[in-house]
Structure formats: structure tokens, C-alpha cells
Curated annotation (Swiss-Prot):
MF annotations from Gene Ontology: flavin adenine dinucleotide binding
Cofactor(s) the protein needs: FAD
Residues annotated to bind FAD: 13-18
Family in the record: Belongs to the MnmG family.
InterPro entries according to UniProt: FAD/NAD-bd_sf, GIDA_C_N, MnmG, MnmG-rel, MnmG-rel_CS, MnmG_C, MnmG_C_subdom, MnmG_C_subdom_sf
PANTHER family (alphabetical): GLUCOSE INHIBITED DIVISION PROTEIN A, PROTEIN MTO1 HOMOLOG, MITOCHONDRIAL
Localization (cell): Cytoplasm
UniProt protein name: tRNA uridine 5-carboxymethylaminomethyl modification enzyme MnmG
Species name: Chromobacterium violaceum (strain ATCC 12472 / DSM 30191 / JCM 1249 / CCUG 213 / NBRC 12614 / NCIMB 9131 / NCTC 9757 / MK)
GO biological process terms held by the UniProt record: tRNA methylation; tRNA wobble uridine modification
Length: 632
């Protein structure tokens, strides 16, 4: 049957990408349908019970700045919060939280059910409805046809998913869930560039069978960081510690004894796994000289005894898993609640996508998450929000949007995917960004919330709070720049000397004094003349003022570097350009450009094998008027 209501946007899949996509499209006012194989698993954390980390926390903050759900759900469900790299510069500081799986999933479910313009429906999707070169709907397993202007596909590991434990394997999207095999076969028929990747998860442990007294306790930070710009510390539930132990030589010997039954080493698994989250057997094989590896026991929640042993992801046979776990200090009597496993699944070459995450081959079809070759909840959520937002814009026949590399880690993520592709699951690191001094966690809202408001994904309450913060930061910076301290006019010169480490000998602005190393804003405000006329600032405002003042010189230099670049990002390449007509390009370069069809000269310049000389030839070609290149 054809469902009686048509939609602007259909989102297929209810994981981290799908939920953000559906919420974003609905926030814009688009009639949105979220199709999931099981409403009970919306927002489920399929692997580790944590959100954030280096690079990943930056993405979560950006999703939050654009009105997304992940950071807020983490504040509601987070049972341990830490700031990583706290002693380093603000560019690489990152928030990480352990989450109670049940609380996190419940928070996401509540947001979905209470979001205007969003309809939920439980049915697996077996096919896409395509007319010509455009998607116009989705067809479920029981034959219901839903029509829509756009479809966002966020299938995670479900497309032709196969689960491996030792040499035993079976089809599945994750443990306990069926794979989307029919949809996987249908997508392969569309001649989209497809490959196989794999990921894995460790065995889960019953905490009652663990001796924590011989392990190192790892508490969260006090006071606890708050993840969301809309979050409050009062939202946080009871906090729990993690625990650290280590593998040993006996563990490694046990694991090596199972290599002959490992699906990874026997060639049973075709897919490539994540480089930065390797299985324990892969670590022992690659780093044979190491006699131990860290294992973090992470609590799964407040109402369960289940623990996630981060660091021992495995697809080895269960007898090897059990023996290896019980060889680890503190886990000699451990009871495994769920076996570890690997899962391999289909992904599609992201070089077949536009920057909006719309497929180049099929109009109105957007991909987000692991289907694009990424790994991680955070990377999925960021793509989901962008795809949902752009699906909404497409449905309204408006121009697509994607941040640039110098504007957001989301821009770095998308640009890396669509220009370089992936040969292994892609995860975000701060080192991937050239302009990371500007792309900090603390200023994600200042970078993106104004654009989010224009696009319709940021609500009134968030916008009002953002405006108050932005205005308070600017007002205090102006006061610091306009306020002068003269040594002869200080009531207590020693007070300022204690803050600065030495007395001043001439007149300085407060801005000049705050620029000095080891002079915190709050300490400077203990000097009466500095605090005169100062407003009472919230911590996040004071932090932003201090960072902007201290790093403005470095940021200015980075901005100059940006300005010196040729405006390659603004020069669009027509979709119908024939690179075979560009004089001077090698056959290899012509082939790569014709295959990948970059949207801008900037994208073209980052394709592997495209030289600066080739970019110069393209610019000459465009300037001669062979094609009509429009400035973005």
C-alpha cells in the first residue's frame, strides 16, 4: 500500500546519525518520517558507553551548537565527565563522558517523541523508491510505500552485516538485531561504489565477578564539565569511577594460541577494521614487543552490574575470550555476560557524495554515518545533522550548506571524506584540522550557532542564551581594551604584582596584561582597579574572554594565512565540465577529476595526485571562458 501521507524528508535508521538527521529536518519545519526496525533501540549505544574525546568532543559541541541532541542527552545520562588534555592549550582540550546506556537512550527517545513535525514508524526498509535519477520514497519489509521529496539513509553496520565470533559467523546488524540484507542487495544494484569495512566490540563483564581492589580507580573531574551549551551540572545523575588494569604475557600467549581460529587472520573477514581502535589480537600481533596493554573497565549504567572492558575488542572464539579475560589482574573470576564479536558491513565510497552528503548519482538521496566509511557515534551524529539539514533544504529547493575546513571539524570531516575517500574506518582527531586553534570546543557556538539559526535548526531558547553570551564576551573584551592601569594610580601596587609576578613600570590596558602567560582572568579581577566596573561573568563567558584575548595574535596570523590562500573554495566547478578538454592535464589527473567530480577548486586541490600545477591549469581553463564557473 501507499501510505496516505507524504513527507518532505524520510530518515532510514534510528542510530546516532538517524536521530540527529530526523531532529534537524523536523526542527526546520519539514514534515519528517523516521523509519526504524525497532523503536526500542532508538539512540542505542551499540558499542562503548561513552561520548566525546579528542576530536570527537569537538564534533559533539558543534552538533550541539547547531541545536543537536547528543551533548544534551549526554548531560542527562552521563555518569562520569572528564576534560582530556586539560593541562594543554584550549585547541586540544576535549570533553569525554561515560554514559548510562538506558538514561542516554531514554533522553534521545523523549526528544524524538516530543519533536514537532516528526513521525516515528517501526518497520525495516527493504527498498528505495526511485524515479529516473531521483529518490521519491522508501518501501518497507511488509510492502508499505512512503513517499517523500528526500531520503536520508543512516544504516550503520546493518547493510549486509555479518557477525563473527571465531570461525562461526551469521548475518546481523549488531548482536540481537537482523541485518538489512535486502536493502544492502538493492543498493548494490544501483551501481554505487561499495566496499566492506569491519568493526568490533569486547566481551561485557559482570562487575560482581571483578576484584576492583587490585585495579587503579579513575574518577571523573570535580567539578564536572558540562557537555551541552544548554546543559547544567544539576542534570547529571550519580557519578561513577572507571577502573584500569592491564593485559600480561599470559594473556598474550592465550590470544596468540587462538590466531589459527581468528576470522581476521584466517581471511574469513574481508573488511578493514579501524586503525585507531584495533582488536586486542591485532594489537598483540602488530605490537609484539609490548608485554601489556591497558584495559579500562567502564560502567554501563547505574542500574546494571555490566562493565565494558575498553581495550580488548575481539572476534576470537569464545573459549579464547574467556581464558584471556580471566588471565587479567582483577578478572580472574570474571563472568562474561555477552561475547565479543566483529561485524563487517557494506559502506559506500564517500567520494560519490556532494559536500551536502547528497549522492551524486541519485538526486535527493543522502548518506550519513558508517555507510560513508566513518566510525564512532560522534562522527555519525555530525554527519546525520548535516544530512538532515540539507535534506530539508533540498525539499524546500534551497541551496545546500556545509561548513568549510576553517569553520568546523564537521567541515574537515566531510571534506576529508568526499575528496580523499576511506581505506579504513575514519575517525576524527584534532590533528586532521589545519586551523585547529580556531576550531576549539569552547567556541563551537560562536562559530556555528548564528548559521544554525539562519538555517532554522536552532530554537528560540538556545538562540537567546547564545546572544547573551556573545554580547557579554564582546562587552567585556571592549572594557578590557578601554581600561588602563597606571602604576602611580594603583591603591595597592603589590596586589597587581602578585598576579603578574612583578610590578608594572608603565601604563597598560587590562587586555595587554591578560595577554601575558600565567595571568588568568579571574586572578586579574582580584585587583580592585581591574574589577572596577566589571560585570559578574559566568564561567563560560570569562573563559571565552580569556582565550580570545590570549590567543588573538596567533589567530590573526592563522587568518592571514587563510587570506593568502587563493580563493579556491569559492570557485565552483560546473557539474558538466569535461576535464579531457583542459589543456596540459595528464591523463591520470583527467581520469581522477572525471571520476570524483569535485564541486570546487578547493576540493579538487585536495584529491590525492592533483598537483598545484594541475590546479593552476584548471584556473586558466576557467578564466578563458571554456565553461561558466560561478563564484559560490
Amino acid at each position: 500500500m501507499i501510505y496516505p501521507t507524504s513527507f518532505d524528508v524520510i530518515v532510514v535508521g534510528g542510530g546516532h546519525a538517524g536521530t540527529e538527521a530526523a531532529l534537524a529536518a523536523a526542527r526546520m519545519g519539514c514534515a519528517t518520517l523516521l523509519l526504524t526496525h525497532n523503536i526500542e533501540t532508538l539512540g542505542q549505544m551499540s558499542c562503548n558507553p561513552s561520548i566525546g574525546g579528542i576530536g570527537k568532543g569537538h564534533l559533539v559541541k558543534e552538533v550541539d551548537a547547531l541545536g543537536g541532541a547528543m551533548a544534551l542527552a549526554t548531560d542527562i545520562g552521563g555518569i562520569q565527565f572528564r576534560t582530556l588534555n586539560a593541562s594543554k592549550g584550549p585547541a586540544v582540550r576535549a570533553t569525554r563522558a561515560q554514559a548510562d546506556r538506558i538514561l542516554y537512550k531514554a533522553a534521545i527517545r523523549e526528544m524524538l517523541e516530543n519533536q514537532p513535525n516528526l513521525t516515528l514508524f517501526q518497520q525495516p526498509v527493504d527498498d528505495l523508491l526511485i524515479e529516473g535519477d531521483r529518490v521519491v520514497g522508501a518501501i518497507t519489509a511488509i510492502g508499505i510505500t512512503f513517499r517523500a521529496k528526500t531520503v536520508v539513509l543512516t544504516a550503520g553496520t546493518f547493510l549486509s552485516g555479518k557477525i563473527h565470533v571465531g570461525l562461526e559467523n551469521y548475518t546481523g546488524g549488531r548482536a540481537g538485531d537482523q541485518a538489512a540484507s535486502t536493502l544492502g542487495e538493492r543498493l548494490r544494484e544501483l551501481n554505487l561504489p561499495v566496499g566492506r569495512l569491519k568493526t568490533g566490540t569486547p566481551p561485557r563483564i559482570d562487575g560482581r565477578s571483578v576484584d576492583f581492589s587490585v585495579m587503579e580507580e579513575q574518577p571523573g573531574d570535580t567539578p564536572e564539565p558540562v557537555f551541552s551549551y544548554r546543559g547544567k551540572r544539576a542534570m547529571h545523575p550519580k557519578q561513577l569511577p572507571c577502573w584500569i588494569t592491564h593485559t600480561n604475557e599470559r594473556t598474550h600467549d592465550i590470544i596468540r594460541s587462538g590466531f589459527d581460529r581468528s576470522p581476521m587472520f584466517t581471511g574469513v573477514i574481508e573488511g578493514v577494521g579501524p586503525r585507531y581502535c584495533p582488536s586486542i589480537e591485532d594489537k598483540i600481533n602488530r605490537f609484539a614487543d609490548k608485554d601489556s596493554h591497558q584495559v579500562f573497565l567502564e560502567p554501563e549504567g547505574l542500574t546494571t552490574h555490566e562493565f565494558y572492558p575498553n581495550g580488548i575488542s575481539t572476534s576470537l572464539p569464545f573459549d579464547i575470550q574467556l581464558a584471556a579475560v580471566r588471565s587479567i589482574r582483577g578478572m580472574e573470576n570474571a563472568h562474561i555476560l555477552r561475547p565479543g564479536y566483529a561485524i563487517e558491513y557494506d559502506y559506500f565510497d564517500p567520494r560519490g557524495l556532494k559536500a551536502s552528503l547528497e549522492t551524486k548519482a541519485i538526486q535527493g538521496l543522502f548518506f550519513a554515518g558508517q555507510i560513508n566509511g566513518t566510525t564512532g557515534y560522534e562522527e555519525a551524529a555530525a554527519q546525520g545533522l548535516l544530512a538532515g539539514l540539507n535534506a530539508g533544504l533540498f525539499a524546500r529547493e534551497q541551496e545546500a550548506w556545509c561548513p568549510r575546513r576553517d569553520e568546523a571539524y564537521l567541515g574537515v570531516l566531510v571534506d576529508d571524506l568526499i575528496t580523499k575517500g576511506v581505506s579504513e574506518p575514519y575517525r576524527m582527531f584534532t590533528s586532521r584540522a589545519e586551523f585547529r586553534l580556531q576550531l576549539r570546543e569552547d567556541n563551537a557556538d560562536l562559530r556555528l550557532t548564528e548559521m544554525g539559526r539562519k538555517l532554522g535548526v536552532v530554537g528560540d531558547e538556545q538562540w537567546d542564551a547564545f546572544c547573551r553570551k556573545r554580547d557579554a564576551v564582546e562587552a567585556e573584551k571592549a572594557r578590557l581594551q578601554a581600561t588602563w592601569l597606571h602604576p602611580s594610580k594603583l591603591a595597592d601596587p603589590a596586589a597587581l604584582a602578585r598576579v603578574l609576578g612583578k610590578p608594572i613600570e608603565r601604563e597598560y590596558t587590562l587586555q595587554d596584561l591578560l595577554k601575558r602567560p600565567n595571568v588568568p582572568y579571574r586572578e586579574l579581577m582580584t585587583v580592585p582597579e581591574a574589577a572596577d566596573g566589571a560585570p559578574e561573568l559566568a564561567d563560560e563567558v570569562a573563559e571565552q574572554v580569556e582565550i580570545q584575548v590570549k590567543y588573538q595574535g596567533y589567530i590573526n596570523r592563522q587568518n592571514e594565512e587563510l587570506a593568502r590562500r587563493d580563493n579556491l573554495e569559492d570557485i565552483r566547478l560546473p557539474g558538466d565540465i569535461d576535464y579531457g578538454l583542459v589543456k596540459g592535464l595528464s591523463k591520470e589527473v583527467q581520469q581522477k577529476l572525471n571520476q570524483q567530480r569535485p564541486e570546487t577548486l578547493g576540493q579538487a586541490s585536495r584529491i590525492q595526485g592533483i598537483t598545484p600545477a594541475a590546479v593552476a591549469l584548471l584556473m586558466v581553463h576557467l578564466r578563458r571562458g571554456f565553461t561558466d564557473a560561478k563564484t559560490a
